[in-house]
Amino acid sequence: MDIHEILNYLPHRYPFVLVDRVLSLELNKEIVAVKNVTINEPFFPGHFPYHPVMPGVLIVEALAQAAAILSFKTMGTKPNDKSVYYFAGMDNVRFKKPVSPGDQLILKVSIDRILRGIWRYKGEALVDGAVVAEAEMMCILKAID
């Protein structure tokens, strides 16, 4: 799935789109996606000017965006102006190695369970085959009031 199709399944837009490509997706199961990290990212001038490191919360956000694509594809729907897909929580988040400009994040997310409209996922972010972050995440689709 290229960026044009990804934008059909994410409500996010620049500078907050954190998924560049989907390598594989199995409905109701898992997604493998890519975030190419470049020196041009808007957060690097402030995090940190002399030693740029991708903020860990944005790595988890990239995992959550991959999860959103998986969920919308699984539901057979797309984001719209009547509902919002909220990031509802995270557990067991671990950052194991820093992510730097030039790295390619491989985002692996699997559906753990869906209960009463709450989706639970397990996610891993890898660089060069090594896990750099992992998290359990929860999301929920809610109507806009």
UniProtKB/Swiss-Prot annotation:
Positions annotated as active site in the UniProt record: 47
Catalytic activity reported: a (3R)-hydroxyacyl-[ACP] = a (2E)-enoyl-[ACP] + H2O
GO biological process: fatty acid biosynthetic process; lipid A biosynthetic process
Main location, first listed in the record: cytoplasm
Keyword Lyase assigned: yes
Cellular compartments annotated: Cytoplasm
Enzyme class: lyase
GO annotations of cellular component type: cytoplasm; membrane
CDD domains assigned: FabZ (cd01288)
Function of the molecule: Involved in unsaturated fatty acids biosynthesis. Catalyzes the dehydration of short chain beta-hydroxyacyl-ACPs and long chain saturated and unsaturated beta-hydroxyacyl-ACPs.
UniProt entry tagged with the keyword Lyase: yes
Pfam family for this entry, one: FabA
Gene Ontology MF terms in the entry: (3R)-hydroxyacyl-[acyl-carrier-protein] dehydratase activity
Species, as recorded: Methylobacillus flagellatus (strain ATCC 51484 / DSM 6875 / VKM B-1610 / KT)
Family: Belongs to the thioester dehydratase family. FabZ subfamily.
Enzyme Commission (EC) number: 4.2.1.59
Keyword vocabulary terms for this entry: Cytoplasm, Lipid A biosynthesis, Lipid biosynthesis, Lipid metabolism, Lyase
UniProt superkingdom: Bacteria
Protein name: 3-hydroxyacyl-[acyl-carrier-protein] dehydratase FabZ
